[in-house]
Design a protein with these regions (language model features):
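Mature catalytic core of soluble alpha/beta enzymes
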Residues: 2-321
Length: 321
C-alpha cells in the first residue's frame, strides 16, 4: 500500500517537474566581426536578457580598448607625453598587463605596441603596394613591448618611446568573450558559448552532453580539419584564411610579423585550445608568427591545452600537448 501511495504521489508531481532548458541564439556586430551567443535557458526572456547584458559588456570593452575609435581610452594614450604616468581604468590596465605578459612569454611574437605598423599595413592593404622604406622604418622604430611600464599600485602606464601606439586587436575579442561568459553565468545562464570571429569561448556543457562540439576549419572550408568536444575552455583559430592580400605577386597575411613590420608571407593557420579566450586569442596569433619552431613554447605556457598548426598542403599536425 505504501508503494502504491508513493507511486501515485510521484505521478502527481510529474507535471510540475522542471522543463528541459531550451537552446537560444543571439547575434550582434562588434569589434569588426560578428559576436554570437548560443545558450541554454528556461525561456527566451531569460536568455535574451542575459545575452543582452553580455553584449553590453563586450561593447564596454570595445569603447575602452579599440584602436579604431579615436576617442577610446586606448587611442588617447598615443598622444600622452613620454615619461608621464597616465592613470588607467581598471579594465584597460588589466588588459595591457595581460598583453605585456604574453608579449614577454612569446618573445614579442605577440606585441600590443604594433599600432604604428598596424595602421601602416591597413593603408598597404588598401593600396596594394608595399610601404616606402622610410615610412616602414619610422613605424618600426615606434614599436616595442618593452618600452612601456605599468605601475600596479598607482594603476598607471608610462610610455618610454616616441610615437607609440597600441593595437589590442589580437587579444580584445578574447578578453571580451571571457567577460561575456562571466556575465551570462552571473545571470543564471552558464551553459553558454560565445563566438567572436575566430575565437570561441565555451561555458558549461549543453544539457545531457559532455561538451560543445567545435569544428576547426582552416584552409579547406568545406570540411572540418577536426571536431573537438569542449566545455569550460576556449579555442581560437588565426592565420592566412580570409584576409590575405597579394602585392607584387606575393601573398601577405593580415597578421603582422613584428620582425619585418609586414604581413606574414608563409601560409599558416594555428588553433590554440586554452583555459580562457584571453589566452587562446593572442597565442593563436603568436603561433602563426613563430611557426613550428614556437609550438612547444606556446604549448608549455600555463593554461594552454593544445596547439595545432596547419598549412594548405599539410595534413593536420599532431598537437604539441
Amino acid at each position: 500500500m505504501l508503494v502504491r501511495h508513493v507511486l501515485w504521489l510521484l505521478a502527481g508531481l510529474a507535471p510540475f517537474a522542471a522543463a528541459a532548458p531550451e537552446k537560444f541564439r543571439f547575434e550582434r556586430p562588434l569589434m569588426g566581426t560578428r559576436f554570437s551567443v548560443i545558450c541554454y535557458a528556461d525561456d527566451r526572456e531569460t536568455a535574451a536578457a542575459a545575452a543582452g547584458a553580455a553584449f553590453l559588456v563586450a561593447e564596454g570593452v570595445n569603447e575602452i580598448a579599440s584602436d579604431y575609435l579615436p576617442e577610446s581610452e586606448l587611442s588617447r594614450l598615443s598622444s600622452r607625453p613620454l615619461g608621464e604616468p597616465v592613470p588607467l581604468s581598471p579594465l584597460l590596465f588589466d588588459l595591457l598587463a595581460h598583453a605585456r605578459a604574453l608579449a614577454e612569454a612569446t618573445g614579442g611574437a605577440f606585441d600590443p605596441t604594433l599600432g604604428p605598423l598596424s595602421k601602416l599595413w591597413r593603408e598597404t592593404r588598401e593600396r596594394r603596394r608595399l610601404p616606402e622604406p622610410d615610412r616602414l622604418e619610422a613605424a618600426r622604430a615606434a614599436v616595442g613591448w618593452r618600452h612601456f611600464t605599468l605601475d600596479p599600485g598607482a594603476r598607471t602606464i608610462t610610455l618610454r618611446r616616441e610615437n607609440m601606439a597600441f593595437d589590442l586587436g589580437g587579444v580584445a575579442k578574447g578578453y571580451a568573450a571571457d567577460l561575456m561568459l562571466e556575465s551570462l553565468a552571473d545571470d543564471g545562464v552558464p551553459r553558454s558559448l560565445i563566438a567572436a570571429g575566430g575565437d570561441i569561448r565555451l561555458g558549461e556543457a549543453p544539457p545531457g552532453r559532455d561538451g560543445w562540439q567545435v569544428a576547426l576549419r582552416t584552409f579547406d572550408s568545406d570540411r572540418p580539419d577536426e571536431i573537438l568536444t569542449l566545455a569550460n575552455a576556449a579555442v581560437s583559430t588565426s592565420g592566412d584564411l580570409h584576409q590575405s592580400v597579394e602585392i607584387d605577386g606575393v601573398t601577405h597575411s593580415h597578421i603582422l610579423d613584428p620582425g619585418t613590420g609586414l604581413g606574414l608571407t608563409r601560409r599558416i593557420a594555428a588553433s590554440v585550445v586554452a583555459a580562457s579566450a584571453k589566452l587562446s586569442d593572442p597565442l593563436a596569433t603568436a603561433a602563426c608568427v613563430l611557426g613550428d619552431d614556437g609550438r612547444e613554447l606556446i604549448a608549455d605556457l600555463p593554461g594552454v591545452r593544445a596547439v595545432k598548426l596547419r598549412t594548405p598542403r599539410d595534413q593536420p599536425t599532431p598537437p604539441a600537448k
